[in-house]
Each structure stands twice: as C-alpha cells, then as structure tokens.
From Swiss-Prot:
The gene coding this protein: luxS
Cofactor details (free text): Binds 1 Fe cation per subunit.
Enzyme class, first EC level, given as a word: lyase
Protein name: S-ribosylhomocysteine lyase
Subunit-level organization: Homodimer.
GO biological process, one term: quorum sensing
Family: Belongs to the LuxS family.
Catalysed reactions listed for this entry: S-(5-deoxy-D-ribos-5-yl)-L-homocysteine = (S)-4,5-dihydroxypentane-2,3-dione + L-homocysteine
Residues that, per the record, bind Fe cation: H54, H58, C128
Listed HAMAP family: LuxS
GO molecular function, one term: iron ion binding
Origin species: Marinomonas sp. (strain MWYL1)
C-alpha cells in the first residue's frame, strides 16, 4: 500500500492549533487544488469530543466558506479527521496559510455567536446521519480554545519523516 502524504509528517512535533498545506495538485484542466490540515489538537495528547467535532463539522463548513471563498478560492469540502484532532479542507485555489488561519479564527468567532442548538444547520434525521449526537456547548468550547491559543503554521519541511527514519521506527 502506498504511504500517504499525511503519514510522512512527524505528529510528535506538530503545533496545534495550526494550518499546514497537506497536498497541492493541479487538475488536467489547470485548476489548482489545495488540501489543508487544520490541526485543532496536539496529536496523541488531545482529542476533540465526539459531539463537539460533529457539531463543529456542521457549523465550520459554512462559516469557513463565508470567510475564505472568493473569486480565487472555492472550498470543496471540510471533513473531520478520523483521529479527531482536526479537519481536512480541500479547495480550489492556493490561499496562503496565513489567509486560511485568519478565516479559521473568524469562523470560530462565528461559532461562538450561535445562540441555540436549533441554529445548527442540517440538524435533522433527513440531512444528518447521527443527528442526535451534537453539542453546541462542546463546539463552542473548541472554538474558544482555538481563539485562546491562536493559530500557527506547521511547516512540511520541519515535520518531514525520511525513508530512513520510517524504516527504523516501523
């Protein structure tokens, strides 16, 4: 099985919260696609709560689009990581990590402004696969944590795991 790019970075040295370009590619028609690692928690030390990350998934996707989409950028998808330490965001365009960080913080401010569970989008059995597994309070605690800690940038070069290192530690 091929080694995916996300497993070529040292998770023991990642800052969090932090933005990292996880992958960049161009389509055959020339569109630039960028995948960002939006790391909310320090890997292997912290984890986002089940209900909090789920509610955040519903809120974050819309709020990030409000702040980041433009004539040059269009978000394709924002999805939680299986390890529950952050989200992956795929988009058309090449915004800087600093632009993404600013949009992320603005989106977290928006999460804090949500007044009630009834304001969470798509929160019903028809549009959500686990519609009862939500907590606005936990999502807002996560948003506050991001804003309190501020968002940094993780460098691929600094986190890169060499073939030799991987062979020694596998």
């Amino acid at each position: 099985m091929p080694l995916l790019d996300s497993f070529r970075v040292d998770h023991t040295r990642m800052d969090a919260p932090a933005v990292r370009v996880a992958k960049s590619m161009s389509t055959p028609k020339g569109d630039d696609i960028t995948v960002f690692d939006l790391r909310f928690c320090v890997p292997n030390e912290e984890i986002l709560s089940e209900k909090g990350i789920h509610t955040l998934e519903h809120l974050f996707a819309g709020f990030m689009r409000d702040h980041l989409n433009s004539n040059n950028v269009e978000i394709i998808d924002i999805s939680p990581m299986g390890c529950r330490t952050g989200f992956y965001m795929s988009l058309i365009g090449t915004p800087s990590e600093e632009t993404v960080a600013a949009s992320w913080k603005a989106a977290m401010e928006d999460v804090l402004k949500v007044k009630a569970k009834s304001d969470i989008p798509e929160l019903n059995e028809y549009q959500c696969g686990t519609y009862e597994m939500h907590s606005l309070e936990e999502a807002q605690e996560i948003a506050k944590m991001i804003l309190d800690r501020d968002v940094k940038v993780n460098s691929n070069e600094e986190l890169y795991l060499s073939e030799e290192f991987l062979k020694e530690h596998s």
